[in-house]
Amino acid sequence: DGAHVAESVLKSIVVYLVIYGLTNLGAFAVVIAVARITRSGEISSFGGLISHAPGMTILMTIFLASLAGIPPLGGWIAKFNSFRAVLDAGSTSAYVLAAIGAVNTAIAAAYYMRVMRVMWMNERPEGQTGTITTPPSIGAAIGICAIGTVVLGILPGLVMRFADLDDLVGLAR
């Protein structure tokens, strides 16, 4: 049933792009906000972020956990749909691709957990002072992305409905 597999794959791509677009935009906006004060994008510059920017730490944790595919965040739905679409193909190459994806997911999750550990457990780097503030536009972007990341994980039907190809084709007519 190749048509079902093709539709499943296309739907998972749309879901993945929407969710990961929000999640990555939010994460990079946090990196920009932190780098404005620390003058660095290095992981170490996030040290002790919880002590001087708890809100930013929580938001970045949401984005990183979503990127790692931790439920109930949007990244979990995106990864689940992607793996399901690949496995629906039922071929040996699909299983190999899923195994490679699983290994990549585990490696990426370890990286994201490392960043979270630095933010929550490490001390603030020596000589780093200043409060992290964001312009309203960046703050709004981070907030919208965080809300979208959480809501699409809890209510995945919102993005799944958007990814319904029959509806998308109907809109294009």
Regions found by a protein language model. Give the residues of each.
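Alpha-helical transmembrane segments of multi-pass membrane proteins predominantly involved
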Residues: 1-173
